[in-house]
Amino acid sequence: MRRRRPLTVRGAGALVAAVCCVIAANVFGTRILLYIGLLLAALTLFSLLAVRLPRRSGTVTRQISTDLLTVSETSRVTVRISLRALRVPHGLWHDILPAAVAGDSGGEYPPESGQLTYPITGVRRGVWPLGPLMLRTVDPFGLAQREQAFGETRSITVVPEVFALAPLAVRVGAAGGTAHTSSTRLGQGSDNLSPRGYIPGDSMRRIHWRATAHRGQLMVRQEEEEESSPDAVVVLDRSAGRWDAPGADADPAFETAVSLCASAAVHLASEGYSVDVIDSAGTLLGALRGHEDDRDGLLVALAMVAPRGEGRDLAALIGGTPPGPLVFITGRLDEEDAARLRPAGAAAPMLFSTELLPGAAEAATPHGWTVATLGPVIADAWEDAVSARIGVGDVPR
């Protein structure tokens, strides 16, 4: 954060003019120039003291209209500042925003409404700090300025965008059977359950994300959640070799893959499937079992994922009963790796790659994969895969 100079351009000019007047008065013996120089210097010093001496302190609270900010979504931030000072200063305020969030977070102080509000738009997923609040004041002559930070920062979570996807051509369940829906699972809403504080050892599946966001500490659901095998599995391949090396800017291909991961999981859950979302190392990123809070938990986890490490064998990742729909999302895929990729008995395996190298699609198809190239438009890639599945035996419902 760049610190402002104590003098404005006008103030610096006045100080330079004062020095020049004093020098000229000595050279030419002109007393009036000496008076002018001393007056400018005194005025600059007075302005500097008037701005810098008053003691100010205060607290800042921020309220965001949405618990989670989605990429491309616009939300509103309300800032309340309790300022303690001898007199209310007049100036300009601005809230410091990270590059991952866009918005016009500034205006005149004090505001007419008594509170500060501004819109923000999610640009890049992740957990980012908002603040601190900066207040800039200038003396009446415009010679000196002061910029002071108030309050602490607040974290905001930007989650991947979820797109509407076309329905599957046919409903399939575990091991190719009919997909089943548990009415007890889908009938419950996590918001109807009383959350409690997190205790070491609690399952991450039971974290109540909305209550956590509201209270600022980890909260979990109190009910005993039954463990069950998923009807569908979504795998996000985070292997470092599949993606570009991390840099200052986000990898567009990986961001698209994360967004498809979220979209596919939410879509399958909306069709009645219980869904597990895992990465290529076997880490559980989310489990959608019909609770209203499951979606938020998945999106929060996906907000923080990045390419890393190496992947494991897909059959070892899934284990147990093969799922019905299996969605595998990867980056750069060559023919050799595609030939080793087996769907582990899944009834409806779909493979999405952001960069299919020559021969990769042909090597994966004989194993039962429906292969689609994942481009910028996620819905189109999904529709291509769903349409292709009709050609390999699925019957439209």
Where do the PLM segments sit?
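Short, structured coil/loop segments at alpha-helix boundaries
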Residues: V9, T30, P98-A99, H291-E292, ...
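Extracellular/lumenal glycan-associated context and N-glycosylation machinery
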Residues: M1-T61
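An amphipathic, basic-hydrophobic helix/alpha-beta surface used to engage anionic
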Residues: A42-G286
